[in-house]
């Protein structure tokens, strides 16, 4: 990554090299269809959290599945310890267990936050890279219960993962929610913009940024929804989102990569799109302050 002047990495060269090497190893294993234990899959982020002054790791909770502990990992990024208002954004991946590209892309993005600190200025980010750990371990879209967790939100679901994520989202009252997915029927990268017009204004440049890595899905109908230049303004019911009664509403964006594209290209597209969303949102806030 070209950091440019005044954008010195918050990681030492040694720590950065360790994180990058772990990321290469994880990508290699995933590309070869090898199932990694959760802690091995998340190794790049776990190493980064050991060395970074800005990233810390914990979980929403731990439970036992088939005799082994599983958990929903959570990572928190804040560039400095200065107490001030920050834009609160939650970024979620792995709600479908058979979509590893979003997990890898999100880990790359968190590494970029340390390597180019200006990127995270004015933000407090809450990162949830594996929201469906039992689905990941089974390599299935659904969780171990057979439920598609991304159709269960705000419906009084009995699914443990959904209940924990709902509680987290309700408590955080995010200014923005971003979800990462992959579509095995898509020829290119696209996204959903939900909420007010801001989501669409953020998504359009994010898709343009992702085009450095993957083509845009320009079909007029995507996944059964009307689309314009890769942007869909409708969505399925029960998806991961803010509580129905949250006011003001956050911007909500869903990024979708073409699942059959090379994993390296998908992860790069996710990173580029996420970087664009933060950059464009910061411009929006600055513009509003000048009005």
Residue ranges and their predicted role:
Residues 73-85:
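Short beta-strand-to-loop junctions in surface cap/lid or active-site-entrance loops
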Residues 97-98, 262:
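Glycine-/small-residue-rich active-site loops that bind phosphorylated ligands and cofactors
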Residues 80-81, 114-119, 284-288:
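Alpha-helix termini
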Residues 2-75:
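Short glycine- and acidic-rich boundary segments immediately preceding or forming the N-terminal edge
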Residues 66, 81-84, 98:
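Short glycine/serine/proline-enriched coil/turn segments at secondary-structure junctions
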Residues 230-291:
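Active-site-adjacent mobile loop/cap segments within catalytic or ligand-binding domains
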Residues 85-88, 100-225, 243-246, 250, ...:
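Active-site/substrate-binding loop(s) of hydrolase catalytic cores
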């Amino acid at each position: 990554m070209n950091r440019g002047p005044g954008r010195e990495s918050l990681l030492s060269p040694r720590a950065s090299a360790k994180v990058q090497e772990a990321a290469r190893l994880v990508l290699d294993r995933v590309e070869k269809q090898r199932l990694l234990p959760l802690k091995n899959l998340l190794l790049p982020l776990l190493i980064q959290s050991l060395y970074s002054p800005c990233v810390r790791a914990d979980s929403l909770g731990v439970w036992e599945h088939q005799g082994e502990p599983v958990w929903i990992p959570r990572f928190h990024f804040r560039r400095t310890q200065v107490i001030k208002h920050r834009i609160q954004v939650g970024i979620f991946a792995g709600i479908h267990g058979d979509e590893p590209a979003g997990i890898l892309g999100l880990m790359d993005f968190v590494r970029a936050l340390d390597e180019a600190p200006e990127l995270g200025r004015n933000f407090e980010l809450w990162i949830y890279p594996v929201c469906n750990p039992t689905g990941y371990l089974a390599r299935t879209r659904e969780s171990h219960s057979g439920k598609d967790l991304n159709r269960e939100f705000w419906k009084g679901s009995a699914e443990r993962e959904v209940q924990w994520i709902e509680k987290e989202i309700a408590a955080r009252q995010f200014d923005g929610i971003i979800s990462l997915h992959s579509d095995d029927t898509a020829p290119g990268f696209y996204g959903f913009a939900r909420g007010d017009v801001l989501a669409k204004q953020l998504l359009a440049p994010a898709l343009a940024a992702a085009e450095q890595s993957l083509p845009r899905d320009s079909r007029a109908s995507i996944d059964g929804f009307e689309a314009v230049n890769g942007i869909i303004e409708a969505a399925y019911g029960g998806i991961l989102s803010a509580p129905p009664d949250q006011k003001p509403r956050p911007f909500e964006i869903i990024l979708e990569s073409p699942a059959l594209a090379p994993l390296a290209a998908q992860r790069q597209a996710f990173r580029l799109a996420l970087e664009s969303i933060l950059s464009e949102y910061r411009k929006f806030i600055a513009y509003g302050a000048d009005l």
